[in-house]
A protein has these predicted regions:
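Conserved alpha/beta-hydrolase catalytic His-Asp/Glu region
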Residues: 2-61
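A short, basic/aromatic alpha-helical/loop segment that forms part
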Residues: 52-53, 75-76, 103-107
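Generic recognition of short, well-ordered alpha-helical segments
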Residues: 57, 80-84, 107-110
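Structural signature of beta-strand start/N-cap positions in the alpha/beta core
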Residues: 58, 65-67, 90-93
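Conserved catalytic core of Hanks-type protein kinase domains
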Residues: 61, 88, 106
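Short beta-strand/loop motif that positions the catalytic acidic residue
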Residues: 62, 68-70, 74
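Short alpha-helix in the alpha/beta-hydrolase fold that links the catalytic acid
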Residues: 64, 78-87
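Catalytic active-site module of serine/aspartate enzymes centered on a nucleophile-bearing elbow/loop
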Residues: 92-125
Length: 125
């Protein structure tokens, strides 16, 4: 649709806000070759997100230990929104990764892995 290319490029820029040229100091060197590779998938995803209306109710139903990890530079799920989300989840823990956008697993893979490992080990105690 009109403006899709620009929207995708902005999402890619915002998603990887904490990294330079989509490189996060981890094994993943290049994530995407062109906006055309994802335009159809992204369109479907955005429509699904836009049509989803029961997020709050769904979050309130979660009762198992939950780890919420956010990037402090994320523009797609700003920290303020992420914190509101995690507050709705009973028994949740929130971690924030600095200098990181929306694509945490690619931008800060090692830091994220460490946080997840610590969370899992704590659950085993």
């Amino acid at each position: 649709e009109a403006g899709d290319d620009k929207a995708i490029l902005l999402m890619m820029k915002w998603g990887y806000e904490g990294s330079k040229a989509f490189i996060g100091g981890n094994p993943v060197k290049k994530i995407i070759n062109s906006s055309r590779e994802i335009i159809e998938i992204l369109s479907v995803d955005l429509k699904a997100c836009n049509n989803y209306k029961s997020g709050k109710e769904s979050l309130e139903k979660i009762n198992c230990p939950t780890l919420c990890i956010f990037g402090d530079l994320d523009k797609m799920v700003p920290l303020k929104v992420g914190n509101k989300m995690s507050e709705l989840i009973k028994n949740s823990e929130t971690k924030v990764i600095t200098d990181c956008g929306h694509m945490i697993i690619f931008e800060k893979a090692f830091e994220m892995r460490k946080i997840v490992k610590e969370f899992i080990l704590k659950l085993k105690k």
